[in-house]
Amino acid sequence: ERQLRPMHSPLVPLVRQFPSHAGHARREYSTQIIGNIAAGSLAESDTVPSTIYMERPLGKNEYVVRVEGKSMEPLIPDGSLVIMRRHTAPPIPKPGTIVEYNDGRGVTLKKLIRRKNAETGKTEYVLQPINPAFKDITPMDGGSISGIYMETLVNYRKG
């Protein structure tokens, strides 16, 4: 009587062995991680480009950065790779949008909100972390919004 025996072969990722698109290999798109972005206080971006492969091409004006810090947890964990879209001109994004803010000395990733200043009574834009252990950046004067958060990469491989 014949018995089935396990084959001894190197492990191959299931997505490669059994592609999700019936009979077609999964497409991958190469892109560069262009640097790091702080999720904490403003910090200078260290540019350490490296290549990754992801399941979709980057759109026009999109780029990938690595998040450093815990101020956007749990939504965007420390060390995550995120896709950002360049933001170059008015209007200011809608409140609630996660943005890349650059004050000329450093960049940070925060949620953009509007609220009334208790002292002046004026409504102002504020950069708010998602993690309540971190403080808001107020006011948002002297800098600009340079990018809009699009998504956190989950399915990618290092080059």
Predicted regions and their residues:
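Structural motif
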Residues: 80-81, 97
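Short solvent-exposed strand/turn elements
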Residues: 122-142
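Residue-level detector of beta-strand face positions
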Residues: 66, 98-100, 126
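Glycine-centered tight beta-turn/hairpin loop motif at sheet-sheet or coil-to-beta transitions
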Residues: 104-105, 132
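Short beta-strand-centered aromatic/proline hotspots
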Residues: 94-98, 109-115
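Short, positionally conserved secondary-structure boundary motifs
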Residues: 2-78, 87-92, 106, 116-121, ...
